[in-house]
Amino acid sequence: MFRPGDSRNAAVTGAQRPAPSVRRVTVRLLTELSAPAIADALGPDSVLVLPTGAIEQHGPHLPVATDLITAQSMAELAVAEFGEELDLWLLPPLAYTKSNEHHWSCGTFWLSAQTMLSVLHDLGSSMTKTPARRLAFLNGHGGNSALLQVAARDLRIAYGLRTFTLHPSLPADHGGKSPESELGLGIHGGHEETSLMLHLRPELVDMEKAQRWVPEQLTEYRHVRFGGSVSFGWTSDDFGPDGVIGDASTATAEHGKEKTEAMLAYLGEAFAEVAAFDPGPRS
């Protein structure tokens, strides 16, 4: 585990590290147990938490590991806060995921949809060798959402697992919020993500390069727009040369802290329901 303020990058080292906090974060890491200890510690209602991030461009001001850092940090904080009570166990994060909407940019590393689904299927198969039967994807990248929904159902059918997908922070194209300065269109590298990173990993943010790049032309359409009733295929360079879709210039660490606290509160409620969920008696 890293200590708050450590400038090394988890995406490079592969280490587990908490988000900055007043206290040291202690996390229930499944990988720190032996195989027999896992068999003894877990039961059918144990919840394995798999953070799913991404390695992709986030403009000139944010690191390519932004989504990974967000997903892993929130998973660590949630498992540290609620793990004992709800029997949550943290898995290592899935860093390389479905990011080909940023395929054009240096620094983006992605899996095809088919490969990612195969990886998730194999992880689900591996999970069946443990006593746990609840798997929760804690997702930090909007581009993963559709595939995680497919994988959740496939794993339910193939292995009888209880599967869940949690989104602590949704972009505007998936129903999340975007400030007025972004016209409700901020989905990538803008106010929300930059604020989060200013709180979680401020040493990795270059606010001198933060900019506003909002696709205002989309406001001309009622249905074909981010979060509209008609979705459309896009890549991030459709809207500007640096891949930013939003207003990073307005980001603050204070907003990032408030957002982190709100996300953690949501995760506490959501994981409580995940741990107790039963769809009901079968007729």
Describe the function of each predicted region.
Residues 2-134, 142-283:
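Extended, histidine- and acidic-residue-enriched regions that form the cofactor-binding/catalytic faces
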